[in-house]
Swiss-Prot record:
N-terminal signal peptide: none
PANTHER family: LIGHT-INDEPENDENT PROTOCHLOROPHYLLIDE REDUCTASE SUBUNIT B (PTHR33712:SF7)
GO biological process: nitrogen fixation; protein-containing complex assembly
SUPFAM superfamilies: Helical backbone' metal receptor
Official protein name in the record: Nitrogenase iron-molybdenum cofactor biosynthesis protein NifN
Gene for this chain: nifN
Family: Belongs to the NifD/NifK/NifE/NifN family.
Function in brief: This protein may play a role in the biosynthesis of the prosthetic group of nitrogenase (FeMo cofactor).
Organism: Rhizobium meliloti (strain 1021) (Ensifer meliloti)
Length: 441
């Protein structure tokens, strides 16, 4: 049985987690013509914006209600209304996704009531723009929770309620926050190879994939799932959720539309992908295409090649719960040993399935103290300081990755993604073991 140890320190040393509103904003960025709006101070928005820009290396349309000291005392409804109207006039978005911050949540404002009043009084001016509220206070949860809350909020506010005529070849996919742009593109490719039509919420592969739209500046996201597609999610024959944190959105969709769902806690590793391919084959009535079978064979060969480099290695991982499970099970399949596991929150049910004895809720300072005998650190770019002090190589995963290019175009799921992860890990071990030692002059 896994023991989950709570954080007992009075201060965070080298933070591991990113905030809930940042996760919520990232989910809203997966909708075409959207603008995420932080309801809080300018500083909250600026910090999140810097992290997003450094990670994606793209312009991010993130806005703020710019709460000041007067609004904190008198209430922020006026700032919220003005921000929504300004965005409608200047950017004409299809969706404004509001993410609350600790500032307004701590004050205890009736945010849902404020927004309902604004929508009622300004209905004519807001025609053509959906406004969605996700309660994402910084003081609770992390990116994982913020992403899930934003997806749930979009389903509740936009998706048409009630059972509808099902499209037998349409599948709704709810990807977890830890899937990269390349992962989502690969998901779409494999689903379409079975003759099925995927509707992916959120779809970052259409909005943050690194293209310049028609050589012009766009004030909103320039791609992603459309608001109309979100509205018609109830026509899907099946919903597939990826990651335990996406169970809530999938349950909400089932409650509102009756669409059944299947949850995959990870799509990394041979067995998990085999189950996914089997489900697609069952839904479509078709066998796995030749190119999918070939990718599976490539993964089998990679497992044989990579296990010589990874077997017996000691791995230290710091990540949010679902990504921790994804990576830990991946390394165990390679014959490695997880000697340190650190995560952001201890409430997720997936933590009890992570193949370790102890999980520490904490920060990268905890990872560093637990990883003194590790052969590899696995976390985001802020782990570089621990890596340098310990002299242990770092495999960069998750968010943010700001000291390498192309992190969002790295595959981590399905047959190809698992294969590529094996190669990456094996190459890290090889290059580190062959690194030149210091020679005195």
């Amino acid at each position: 049985m896994v023991r989950i140890l709570s954080q007992t320190k009075w201060a965070t040393i080298n933070p591991l987690k990113s905030s809930q509103p940042l996760g919520g904003a990232l989910a809203f960025l997966g909708v075409g013509g959207a603008i995420p709006l932080f309801h809080g101070s300018q500083g909250c928005t600026s910090f999140a914006l810097v992290l997003l820009v450094r990670h994606f290396k793209e312009a991010i349309p993130l806005q703020t209600t710019a709460m000041d000291d007067v609004a904190i005392v008198l209430g922020g409804a006026g700032h919220l209304e003005q921000a929504i109207l300004n965005l409608k006039i200047r950017a004409k978005p299809k969706l404004i996704g509001i993410c609350t911050t600790a500032l307004v949540e701590t004050r205890g404002e009736d945010l849902a009531g404020d927004l309902a009043s604004i929508k009622l009084e300004r209905a004519e001016e807001l025609t053509g723009t959906d406004v969605v509220l996700a309660n994402t206070p910084d003081f609770d949860g992390a990116m994982e929770e913020g992403w899930a809350k934003a997806v749930t909020a979009m389903i509740k506010a936009i998706t048409r309620i009630g059972e509808q005529e099902r499209q037998s070849r349409t599948i709704a996919i709810l990807p977890g926050w830890n899937l990269t742009i390349a992962d989502i593109e690969q998901l779409r490719d494999i689903v379409e190879s079975f003759g099925l039509k995927p509707i992916i919420l959120p779809d970052l592969s259409g909005s943050l994939d690194g293209i310049v739209p028609d050589d012009r500046w766009v004030p909103t996201t320039y791609g992603g799932i459309s608001v109309e597609e979100i509205r018609e999610l109830g026509t899907a024959a099946q919903c597939i959720a990826i990651g335990e944190h996406m169970r809530g959105p999938a349950e909400e969709m089932k409650t509102l539309t009756g669409v059944p769902y299947v949850l995959f806690q990870s799509l990394t590793g041979l067995n998990a992908v085999d189950r996914f391919v089997s489900l697609l084959s069952s839904i479509s009535g078709r066998p796995a295409p030749a190119k999918v079978r070939r990718r599976r064979a490539q993964l089998q060969d990679a497992l044989l090649d990579g296990h010589f480099h990874s077997a017996g290695k000691k791995i230290a991982i710091a990540a949010e719960p679902d990504q921790l499970y994804q990576l830990a099970t991946f390394f165990i399949c390679l014959g490695a040993e997880i000697v340190a596991a650190v995560t952001t929150k201890g409430a997720s049910k997936i933590l009890h399935k992570v193949p370790v004895e102890i999980i520490q809720v904490g920060d990268l300072g905890d990872l560093e103290s637990l990883a003194t005998h590790a052969d590899l650190l696995v976390t985001h770019s802020h782990g570089q300081h621990a890596s340098a002090r310990l002299g242990t190589p770092l495999m960069r995963v998750g968010f943010p990755v700001f000291d390498q290019l192309g992190s969002q175009h790295k595959l981590t799921i399905l047959y190809h993604g698992t294969r590529d992860l094996i190669f990456e890990v094996s190459n890290i071990f090889q290059s580190h073991s062959l690194a030149p030692t210091h020679r005195g002059t």
